[in-house]
Amino acid sequence: MSVDSLVSCLEQLITDDLKLVEHQEVSNGATWASALQSTKDVPSHALTKTIVLKPKTAKSQTVVPIILAALETTSTPSGIAAKAVGSKEARMAAADLVEEVFGIPPTDVGIFSVNKENASKVHVVLDAALIQHNGLLAFHPSSSAKTVFVSPAAVQTYLKSVGVNPIIVDFSAPGSATAPSKPAAQKKKAEPSKNDAAIENAALIGITVRKDADFPNWYQQVLTKSDMIEYYDISGCYILKPWSYSIWEAIQGWFDKEIKKLGVRNGYFPLFVSSKVLEKEKDHVEGFAPEVAWVTRAGTSELDEPIAIRPTSETVMYPYYAKWIRSHRDLPLKLNQWNSVVRWEFKNPQPFLRTREFLWQEGHTAHMTLEGATEEVHQILDLYARIYTDLLAVPVIKGVKSENEKFAGGMFTTTVEGYIPTTGRGIQGATSHCLGQNFSKMFNIVVEDPNAEIGPTGERPKLFVWQNSWGLSTRTIGVAVMVHGDDKGLKLPPAIALVQSVVVPCGITNKTTDQERNEIEGFCSKLADRLNAADIRTEADLRAYTPGYKFSHWEMKGVPLRLEYGPNDAKKNQVTAVRRDTFEKIPVPLNNLEKGVSDLLAKIQTNMYETAKAERDAHVVKVKEWADFVPALNKKNIVMIPWCNTTECEKEIKKNSARQVNGDEPEDEKAPSMGAKSLCIPLEQPSGEDAIIEGTTKCAGCGNLAKVWGLFGRSY
């Protein structure tokens, strides 16, 4: 479990005494105490220690490590802990054993590193003095750079929630008996909560919580169990595995071809930018300042001047645009780069949605006229919309950002906005900005105006170029996962799935001869070869698992189509296709295999988009009175209102619609928005009887005259 998921889990279980602080990485109790002393707002507490021991075990048996949590001041002989679990002796567990069980280095392990996934693989021993402590306890929440402060009761509540009955040991009386803690008296059944999210009889390889009941945990499980990502040891950074990176490659391949049709060419600019250059455009740098990561030292030497790691590349690229653009004949200049950027300042990272480093493309173009720049802004916006609709099967709304939400330092920003049905939140999908002449004036990107008259100096007047920037990131992947996934796991549109169909041999029993088995499996391999030859990405699953296990595995990974082939199918000269989106079974004749499978994949792609669009459309509601605004939001809608399009009104709408924070919804500027923010001003405005009547229609937010219909919603 990641630190963020753990904190979310603790917030759900514990109503009081939960506080989390960040500090430098520590390696022992002394450095930990020192780090906390230099950290602000640390409550009074007792330090703890968490030790992982390896009990003496016969070679024929599986090692079950002991995880021991105690007060830092308690002496904890390993022999006593070993005796408590029925072993003769124990020693410190090697780092590889710790990482195998908990997935993190030993220095990061805390009692909360025990979870539902590994609880059955460990013995949990608690120091009696820790349980009896009157006050807060300090633990590492699976990261040595963070500390969570909780009560002893909270520790026991958490362990109970993951199915652990810890062994309590009084280390001050070595001869005393040890026993599992007594279960608490049974309480009256509580109202349904996220604790009710568990899916009964869920296989260990499958998703164990319902999407609609515990969305954060569901999302984390889907990403890890489907093999899309691996959590990294730096918070907010993630490893993209082939199952997710292939989606980015599909997007990259499609978009790269399309922008080249517009005359865009690829290049690459350095990762680093000097503070002098970064700070040249005031509004721009203020928009990114809290998120900029700085390199201040090389080895043991302090740098003379700190160097920023790019949060975006306007200030990296534009000094060289000024050098390269010397004449109107050099225009338009259209460059794109595929790279990663770093944006550091936030507390609640989410894979793909809010990460400290992310992959994206950023296009930067320079034009002779505003008209030319504006035309390109909308061309790119249309391409972004097609990525969502045609590849990811996700509906989006095209619009213009408000003044408050536009790109820092830009003239105007266009956007494609998505919708996550489970949470009722909007999500920004991609943006295409017209920067106007702001940056060209800062960086002196000028040409002679070819349409102006030659002046007394023999030269034509100078013209500052018009610029655009536009970007789309791996956030696209997270949006698709959230929109399409279900309680079984991922649900991938065929257009972007690494594996579009999987062939599974069926009907093999104990009575099946080796020859029959080989014939069935061999034919499955040939079916996969046929489909791959027809450019249908296919695998044959010949692993020594049951068909049921394979079905669950590929359903969880979201493969659009499963093809079953067994003795009965052989008799009928067919395969049985099973759609991931509907679980409908369709026989496909072998003599029409390639076309039959291709047609089914096309139907799946279309159905996934239409299903998502119908869900989205049902939750875009028009509201003309403020009294109806918040009730509409609370029904998981995004809301269209007649709006005056002023920043003051926008801020009041967000403030007045904010709701009480609970559960997984942390309250910080970059966290999922509690109040409704302006998502966009849709390019397609309501018409007919809903059209804005100038001088008559009132703003639903403030009562002044409305200018446009604005789309508002809680958002990521």
Curated annotation (Swiss-Prot):
Residues 655-675 are annotated as: Disordered. Its main location: cytoplasm. It is an enzyme of class 6 (ligase). Keywords: Aminoacyl-tRNA synthetase, ATP-binding, Cytoplasm, Ligase, Nucleotide-binding, Protein biosynthesis. PROSITE patterns: AA_TRNA_LIGASE_II (PS50862). GO terms for biological process: cytoplasmic translation; prolyl-tRNA aminoacylation. GO terms for cellular component: aminoacyl-tRNA synthetase multienzyme complex; cytoplasm; cytosol. Transmembrane segments: none annotated. SMART domains: ProRS-C_1. GO terms for molecular function: ATP binding; Cys-tRNA(Pro) deacylase activity; proline-tRNA ligase activity. Coiled coil: none annotated. CDD domains: ProRS_anticodon_zinc (cd00862), ProRS_core_arch_euk (cd00778). It comes from the Eukaryota. It is found in: Cytoplasm. It catalyses: tRNA(Pro) + L-proline + ATP = L-prolyl-tRNA(Pro) + AMP + diphosphate. Its EC number is 6.1.1.15. Belongs to the class-II aminoacyl-tRNA synthetase family. This is Putative proline--tRNA ligase C19C7.06. It comes from Schizosaccharomyces pombe (strain 972 / ATCC 24843) (Fission yeast).
